[in-house]
Amino acid sequence: MLDVDLEAPELRALASYYRGRGGMLWVAGEVDGMVAAAPLDGGAWEICRVYVHPRLHGAGLGRELLELAERHALAQGATEVVLWTDTRFRRAHRFYENHSYVRAGPIRALHDIANTVEYRYAKPVHGVRQLDAAGAQSAERRLADVLRACVDSGASVSFLRPLAPERALDFWQGITRRVGQGEVLLFAAWSEGVLAGTVQLVLHTAEIGRHRAEIAKFLVHPAFRGRGLGDALLDAAEAAAATAGRTLLLLDTKPGDGADRLYARRGWTEAGRIEGYTRESDGREYATVIMLKRL
């Protein structure tokens, strides 16, 4: 039992504050950890006060508290979950990134005694977002997990099985640089608050090719297929291409892996086929199909 007024009187004020906002406050054990959640405008919920006693770091309590607050927010109809974290707390950044949060929006200064500056992290419950360079960097580890899962399931996306974690992470770090340079538009898709899919729009920069763009690394985690993420990602990429003035889209895909049927259903047409284009983990050579779509 915890005597709030005697042992932690500040908790009563915190609990009253979040209740007044229509939210909730949870504590664990003898105040070994705590978390709060409160609604914002527009269907978003904010996760606040995520604290775990240092002696329990790595024990899983932080994950349990965060998931408890997220479940409550989703049960209340949240469409997005946001939080703020000190720019100096790299361990916290990785923790949130492992739970599919990405950097989103500008930083904020609190003008407090510690001169705190905070990053804003967010994730939609469902849907697709375009990631800027900061968002891409914060998503690298989760995107690496998605890439490895797709490669392990047989996807033909330039890598052989098994794909080492460090190679997958190195690939996405390179993509972050290209996003920052404006060469690539990167999109991520969430389902039930989990970052589970991605696609890239590669913008051709040659003077004679500025009307073209290429769809690349179209990936949906095997555990999340059949939920419409593929269509949502392509919708976002094609809309962005049109906004950028690109009228011709190109891609290549392995015939018979399912993605080619999705593209055909969406109005893509086959422009050519190259036999023996890839040699994969089983030692066999496979064809690739070049497809195009005019916007």
Located regions from the model:
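Acetyl-CoA-dependent GNAT
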Residues: M1-R49, H53-P54, L66-L68, H72, ...
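A generic structural signal for beta-strand entry/edge sites
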Residues: G42-A44, E80, E118, R210-R212, ...
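Active-site acidic-Proline motif in GNAT/NAT acetyltransferases
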Residues: H53-R55, A59, T87-R88, H221-A223, ...
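Loop/helix-junction capping segments adjacent to catalytic residues or to phosphate/diphosphate-binding pockets
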Residues: A59, R90, Q137, G209, ...
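Conserved GNAT acetyl-CoA-binding A-motif
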Residues: L66, H72-T85, L234, A241-K254
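C-terminal "cap" of GNAT-fold acetyltransferases
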Residues: V82-H99, G105-A136, C150, T247-D260, ...
